[in-house]
Structure formats: C-alpha cells, structure tokens
Swiss-Prot record:
It comes from Borrelia hermsii (strain HS1 / DAH). Residues 1-15 have a biased composition (Basic residues). Belongs to the universal ribosomal protein uL16 family. One of its GO terms (cellular component) is cytosolic large ribosomal subunit. The lineage of its organism: Bacteria, Pseudomonadati, Spirochaetota, Spirochaetia, Spirochaetales. This is Large ribosomal subunit protein uL16. Residues 1-20 are annotated as: Disordered. Binds 23S rRNA and is also seen to make contacts with the A and possibly P site tRNAs. It holds the Pfam family Ribosomal_L16. Coiled coil: none annotated. GO terms for molecular function: rRNA binding; structural constituent of ribosome; tRNA binding.
Length: 138
C-alpha cells in the first residue's frame, strides 16, 4: 500500500477539506481519467482496491497512473483505552481529494474498456466520480 517513506512530522491535525481543486484537475499523462465530484479523504487501502479493480478489468492492457498519494496521517487510539495520555499512533494514511481532482488516468485501451474499468474502480471509492476524456482526443 502507498505511504510516505519519510515525513517531517509524524502526526497532524485533521483539518477540513473544502472547495475545488486548482492543482491536479487536468489529465496529464493518459487519455482517460477518473475525476472526483466530492471532497473526501481517501485511504491508501481504497486507492489500492481501485487500482487492482482497474488493472484486472483491462487484463494487462494499457497503463494506469495513480494521481493521488496518501500523505496525511490518520491517528487512532487503541480500543478500550481511557481518554488522555496523548494522541494515538498513526493508524493509516489518507489522500485529500477535492472536487475536480483527477484521481486515476489510463491509456492504451479502447474507450469502452477504459470507461468500464474506471466505473469498476469508482465503486471502490467513497466519492462520486465521473469519467473524462482528454480534450485533444475528442
């Protein structure tokens, strides 16, 4: 699963996501993309599940790019632990996704197959998504 190799600070305050994406909102590498229509923190496990679903659907054909990376730590205290005694340890890593963020890109497969694979991956994610095609291909 994806996680940062090294971080400046181990733990972080949660914060809140709002607004639309100004970076990472255009298709850069592939021909097709999966774009978020919601704002959410997506876990590394969800990203991996979507990637596996896509690659299995296209059966070794084409190339897939993951455009989001889980670099925000999510801490959690152990079960049945009393409050206090400091912040819990890092449980997993999240990727912040805003409205309009291109999460996955794909190239080298027919449009119908790419759309089917992206929709399958979309069902593994907690956000509403849409399938987009690079402008110069239309």
């Amino acid at each position: 699963m994806l996680s940062p190799k090294k971080v400046k600070y181990r733990k972080k305050q949660r914060g809140r996501l709002s607004g639309e994406a100004h970076k990472g909102n255009k298709i850069s590498f592939g021909e097709y993309g999966l774009v978020s229509l919601d704002t959410y923190f997506i876990t590394a496990r969800q990203i991996e599940a979507a990637r596996v679903a896509m690659t299995r659907r296209v059966k070794r054909g084409g190339k897939v790019w993951i455009r989001i990376f889980p670099d925000v730590p999510y801490t959690k205290k152990p079960a049945e632990t009393r409050m206090g005694k400091g912040k819990g340890g890092v449980d997993h890593w999240n990727a912040p996704v805003k409205i309009g963020t291109v999460m996955f890109e794909m190239a080298g497969v027919p449009r119908e197959l790419a759309e089917a694979a992206m929709m399958l991956a979309s069902s593994k994610l907690p956000v509403k998504t849409t399938f987009v095609v690079r402008r110069d291909l239309r």
